[in-house]
Design a protein with these regions (language model features):
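Cytosolic regulatory regions of ion transport systems
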Residues: 1-81
Length: 81
């Protein structure tokens, strides 16, 4: 399966890595470079961008994904957008 995980904090990072270890294709998205650095070797692709920015979201291959997971916990409003 193809997953897109938006938000690579504690929860999103563990989820994305575990999905990848299970043989899934996982793309990770986060706006913090330290979160990107922590997973870039374990995920298929990573994007450093702000998921609250609609123009940035247009850069993501959303139509190619089977499942999109929003794992944004610090800004609840961003996770609802």
């Amino acid at each position: 399966m193809k997953y897109l995980v938006i938000g690579l904090g504690t929860y999103g990072r563990e989820l994305a890595i575990n999905l990848s270890l299970q043989g899934n294709e996982v793309i990770g998205v986060d706006h913090r470079s330290e979160n990107i650095e922590a997973v870039k070797e374990q995920l298929m692709t990573v994007y450093e961008l702000d998921a609250k920015d609609e123009n940035s979201l247009k850069l993501l291959p959303l139509k190619n994904m089977d499942i999109v997971i929003v794992a944004i916990g610090e800004d609840f409003g961003a996770s609802l957008k």
